[in-house]
Amino acid sequence: SVDLTKNAGVRCVNFNEADLITCFANDYGFEKWVEKAVEFYGDEGDVLIVISSSGSSENMLNGIKAARNGNLKSVITLSGFDEHNPLRQLGDINLWVDSRAYNFVENIHQVWLLAIVDLIIGSREYSV
């Protein structure tokens, strides 16, 4: 998220701060922490990227529901495992890895995220 903000001027935040997760999970329950983060930090017109290896993490599914209720522009999902996982059913753009191996799914997700950043800032940074 820092690369998008710094290099592309795109306001971008991530919800992987330990204090945010701990506070919201303690106060609202683990299943609701992403939902609450989206409610507090998401603005109308934002894009939410949701990542779940299995595509069935309840906290992530609730985050998407909050995005829909908060009028975020779109939801991009990255998942793996079952092709018909619940996460994939809720996104506007869905990237899916055909594997049940966590390490493989997570590594492919990382490559895709880096590719998205490169597509957005690439013309400014690279001559290729």
Segments the model singles out, each with a brief description of its role:
Residues 1-128:
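Glycine-rich phosphate-binding loops that contact phosphosugars or nucleotide phosphates
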